[in-house]
C-alpha cells in the first residue's frame, strides 16, 4: 500500500542516509534475533537527556508540568560520551528511480522528490507549493482530482526533516 510506497521512496531518496537505510523497528532480520544486550546498550547510549527533547502544548500549569517532568525524567543521566553523528551526504539524483512494490493492499502510486532540510529557505517555498497543490479543500489536487472524483484519493505534502526533506505526491486510482 501507500505506506510501503513511502518506505521504498525513502530508500531511493536517501540510499546513504538513515532516513532511507533504517526503519523505526529495524529489518525483519533484526527482529528475528534481537540481542537483549545490544538493545540495552543502544538504549543507554542514545536514550539520554542530552539526546532528547520534551515537547508540550496546551493549557499547562508550569509548576505542575516541571514537577511531572522531574518525576519521570529527572533520574535519567546524560551520556557525556554521546557520539556526534556524522551522517553521509547524498549524491545528486540524476535520473528517475522507479520501483514496483508488491503487497496485499490496493494499487497506489507515490512520487517523491528530495529537498534540503527544515532549516533551508527551500523548505519554506516547498510548504507554500504544497498548500497550492493540496490543502484538503481548494488545492489543485483537491479541485481537479479529488472533488471531481477522478481518483479514489490523492494527496501531496512535504515531509520536513532535519538533514533533508521530501515532497510526496500520491494517490489511489478508482
Tell me the role of every PLM-derived stretch.
Residues 47-50, 92-94, 103-108, 123-124, ...:
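Short, solvent-exposed loop/turn segments at the edges of secondary structure
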Residues 7-29, 51-57, 107-116, 143-174:
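M16 family metallopeptidases and their MPP-like homologs
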Residues 14, 18, 36, 40, ...:
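Sec-exported extracytoplasmic/periplasmic mature domains
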Residues 40-43, 96-100, 153-159:
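Short beta-strand/turn micro-motifs at beta-sheet edges
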Residues 16, 53-117:
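An aromatic/glycine/proline-enriched structural segment found at the starts
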Residues 111, 121-133, 141-143:
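Active/ligand-binding-proximal structured segments within catalytic/core domains
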Residues 11-52, 84-89, 126:
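Histidine-acidic residue clusters that define the catalytic metal-binding segment
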Residues 1-6:
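Short, small-residue-biased leader/transition segments that mark boundaries at the very start
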